[in-house]
C-alpha cells in the first residue's frame, strides 16, 4: 500500500518508520506531540488506531480542560486509562478506532459520533456520548453545556484470532494460505442473525484470496446458506475512515494479545465481590431523556465521591468507629466485612489502592484472559493481515503494560518480539527506540 492515509502535503517524512516502546501507555503521548511539533504529524485531523484490551478513553475527572494547552502539565496529569481524550479535546485526534480482542467489550460495538468539549459549569473535559463506559464515570453532559466542542468519530472493532483448521491432510500441514481475519461485531445486529459466532472475517475481495482461505475455520456459521452475517467489516470501510484524516498513528498495547486483571490477585474472591457491590453501576434503560441522563450521572458522581471520601478517611484511621460510621450510609453496609478481611491479611491495608480497584468494578470487570501461545500467534497474524491492507502509519507507539501487571510479565517480552517482527515484515527497517525503563521525552 501507499505510505499515506490521505493528503500529506507539507508534512515531513521519517527516513524509517519510528517505533517507540514505553512501559505505561500514557507515556506514548509525548512522542506523538513531538511528531506534531516536528511537522511529521499534522496538528489536527489525525486518525488514531488503538489495539488494546482497554479503551483508555476516560478523562482525568477533575483536570481543567485548558490543561491540554500546557503539555508539560498535561503529561503529569495523565494515567493509563485517560490519555487519549485530552488529545481529542486539544484538536489533534479526530478519529479513533479501538481494535479490541474478543474478551474486551467495554464499549458498544460499532460507530459512535459524539462531542468532546469543556463543561461550562466545571471547566473540565466532558463528552456527549451516552455509552455506559462514559456514564459510569460521570463523564456525560448535554451538548448545550459544552463549549469549544470537538467532534469525534469512534469506531469499535473486534479482532478475532483466526483459528487454523486442523483437518488438513498431513502434506498440507504447513500452508502459506493460513491467513487471519478481522472481525467487526455490531451488537445491534447480533440478535438478528443466527450465527454461532458474532462476526465474519475481513478479506480482500478477490477470488484468489477466498480460495486461499479454504483451510481456515469459519469464525461465523450461519444456519442458512442464503443468510449472510450482517457484521462483517471490510478493508474499504477502514480505509474510508483513514482517508478522512491527514495521517494516522498506529498504537499497540501488548496486553491486546494477553491480559490480566491485576486486582484479582490483590484481593480475595470475597473482597472483590464486595468491591463490585459497593461500586456497581446499574446500566440504565433505553429511551432516556436528557434529564434522565443528567440525573443518572449526578447520582453516579455522588456515589463515587462518597466512596473516595470513605477510603481517604480510612487511610487516616480504620478503627471500628470510623468504619461503622461510613458503613451506616445507604449501600455501604458491606464495608465492615471488607475492612475486617483486609486487616486479617495485611497489617496496614492500602485503602487508596482499594479505591482504585473499586473504580474498575462498575458495569463490567476488567478484562482477564491469559492467552496461550497459539492464541497470541493467531492474534499477531490477524493484526498483520489487517495492517498489510492499510496505508503505512506515520509512526508506531507500543506500550508494554507489564510493570502494573496488565500484560503478563512472563509473556510480555515474547509478545513484544513477535509484534516487532510483524512490523518489520510489514514496513521494513524500523527506527526502534525503547524507553520502557526510562522517562519519555518532554
From Swiss-Prot:
Protein's name in the database: UPF0489 protein C5orf22
PANTHER family the UniProt entry points to: MISEXPRESSION SUPPRESSOR OF RAS 6 (PTHR13225), UPF0489 PROTEIN C5ORF22 (PTHR13225:SF3)
Coiled-coil residues: none
Superkingdom per UniProt: Eukaryota
Region (Disordered) residue spans: 175-210
Family membership: Belongs to the UPF0489 family.
Cited InterPro entries: UPF0489
Polar residues composition bias: residue spans: 189-200
